[in-house]
């Protein structure tokens, strides 16, 4: 199996990629819709800075998705959240679906 099957990506989120900071606050790129499987389960995850933070949702996307940490994401119910971090999950040729795990605040 190469990639997570498209029929599993039942939800759509809108991602505004984080581009950096300015004197007026964070800068985001243009919004784009991303097909994902959304799991709204609260758990503790580690941020890129090493802090333990609470993630309220995890989205699973196709492995080629580009979602930088600190990007803004709008979930199907309208909740706007921030990407804590992402993790590429590659089975290395095993019969597991490769995907991108997106941990959301």
Language model segments and positions:
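N-terminal intrinsically disordered, low-complexity, charge/repeat-rich segments that act as generic
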Residues: 1-8
